[in-house]
Every structure is written in structure tokens, then in C-alpha cells.
């Protein structure tokens, strides 16, 4: 409630252990079911939802059973938990590129590196289950290493597992769907699709992205136009 008072549009809780944390193992379960329900009730009272950091199937199951609507990361999910996510109309907001490419650093402790290796090993299973149950998944920016670090690389990483059109749908329509889960607290309006009456946020790139997603991975050279809410912010022919 304090975070909502200061302007939060949705609430994030930590559902289990983290890679970069110094003390908690990945398998640890953190909030109790009652604590999760209390957070969900507080968010619901304001017309919004709760998202949660979680890797393991056990954490995901506890969170979703108690009302959490978005799982951040989710790399160690199993079939039963994935089916539950779908049944409860929850989503998985994950990152692929950063775990395979960026989450390897000399400044990480041995404990952190062990945890990174553990969650990285679950990536292909997560992808398989997202496909199997047709779970909504957006492009998450829930990571470190600078503002939006590695986000352009997410396009080419996902293209290893999905068609270019599917990847674009995840980054736009599905991402918009997730943000709109904030309901009455959604400050962005209807966006994520090109549709009459919706927010006119558009990017134009020099290249055919349905044929080559690497066009999107190099915005410094390929991004020709940025339109924000109908206003041209950048134009470079």
C-alpha cells in the first residue's frame, strides 16, 4: 500500500532465491501463502496486480496459486507449474539473452556463478513449456548491467526458438497485454498494437524485420524513426 501510495502501477514481490543475491539459494521459498495473498489483496484493492521474481516450479506454484499474475524469469519451471500458469491466466515475463550471454561476469562470486549456471540450464525447457501451453510472454527488462542492457539481443536470441513474427508479437502485442494488466492504474492507455484509437507508439527500421530480426538488434544504425504518442521524437532517413 505504501508503494501504491507513492505511484506504483503494479507490485513486485520476491518469490524465491535470486542469482545476484549474496545469501539465498535458488531453491528457497520466501513469502508465505498468507503474505502473498495479502500483497495480492492490497494490489487488487487498487485495481492492479502482483508480479513476482521466481525461478523454481515450487515458487511459481505457490505464487500463482495465491493470485500472482506475472512470473518474472521462471527458468526452472516444470510441466505442472506451467499448466497452472496457463489455467490461472497468468503470464511469464522472462529474459533469454541476458542469461545466456551477459550473466557471466568476473565480479560475480562463486555462489552467484553457481546459481547463474543452474537457472541458465533451464532455458530450453522453459521455452518448450511456453510453447506447449501457449503462455503469454513479453520482453522483460528485469535485469541488471545498465539501462535495458542486452534488450536488442533478445530479438536474435528468441529467433533461435520462435519465428520472426512470433518474436515481434511477444515484444509488442504480448508486452502491451502484460502492461495493461495494471487495469485502472495503467497510465499508458491501449498500446502494443497498431489499431485505430490506440496509442501511436511506432518504430520504423531500415530493413525487413520479418526476414531478419538482427535489424532490431542494431538500433544505433537501423532505427530510422521513433514516434511516441503520435509525436515524432527521432527521424533519421
Predicted features by range, described:
Residues 45, 49, 120-208:
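His/Asp/Glu-enriched, well-ordered alpha-helical/loop segment
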Residues 17-19, 98-99, 176-177, 209-210, ...:
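Active-site/binding-pocket entry motifs
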Residues 2, 177-179, 226:
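Short alpha-helical functional segments enriched in proximate histidine and acidic residues
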Residues 9, 69, 201:
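Receiver (REC) domain switch/active-site residues of two-component response regulators
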Residues 186, 191-237:
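C-terminal cap of metal-dependent C-N hydrolases
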Residues 14-124, 132, 136-138, 205-206:
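Active-site core of metal-dependent hydrolases
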Residues 1-12, 41:
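Alpha-helical scaffold segments that flank or form the walls of functional sites
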